[in-house]
C-alpha cells in the first residue's frame, strides 16, 4: 500500500484538516490533525484513526502503523517536534 492511498482513505473517512503519512510499503507512520479529536483521550484518538484502516491491517496490506493524532491547537504547538 502506498502512503498517498492511506492519506486518501483517512481524508475520505474522517473530517481531518491534515494527514501526513510516511512509510516503506508495510510499516507506516501517520500524523492526523482534526477538530474531531478535541476532548478525546490519546487512546480514543488512535482508535478513531485505526477504524478506517482496519480492513487494510486485516488483509496485511498494512503490517504496522504508528499513529499520532492532534487537534489543530495541539498540532500548532507540537508540529516542530515532529519535523514540520
From Swiss-Prot:
<dbReference type="GO" id="GO:0051537">
    <property type="term" value="F:2 iron, 2 sulfur cluster binding"/>
</dbReference>
<dbReference type="GO" id="GO:1990229">
    <property type="term" value="C:iron-sulfur cluster assembly complex"/>
</dbReference>
<comment type="function">
    <text>Involved in cell resistance against acid stress.</text>
</comment>
<dbReference type="GO" id="GO:0016226">
    <property type="term" value="P:iron-sulfur cluster assembly"/>
</dbReference>
<comment type="similarity">
    <text>Belongs to the BolA/IbaG family.</text>
</comment>
<dbReference type="InterPro" id="IPR002634">
    <property type="entry name" value="BolA"/>
</dbReference>
<protein>
    <recommendedName>
        <fullName>Acid stress protein IbaG</fullName>
    </recommendedName>
</protein>
<dbReference type="GO" id="GO:0005829">
    <property type="term" value="C:cytosol"/>
</dbReference>
<dbReference type="Pfam" id="PF01722">
    <property type="entry name" value="BolA"/>
</dbReference>
<dbReference type="GO" id="GO:0097533">
    <property type="term" value="P:cellular stress response to acid chemical"/>
</dbReference>
<dbReference type="GO" id="GO:0006879">
    <property type="term" value="P:intracellular iron ion homeostasis"/>
</dbReference>
<keyword id="KW-0346">Stress response</keyword>
<dbReference type="GO" id="GO:0045454">
    <property type="term" value="P:cell redox homeostasis"/>
</dbReference>
<dbReference type="InterPro" id="IPR050961">
    <property type="entry name" value="BolA/IbaG_stress_morph_reg"/>
</dbReference>
<dbReference type="InterPro" id="IPR036065">
    <property type="entry name" value="BolA-like_sf"/>
</dbReference>
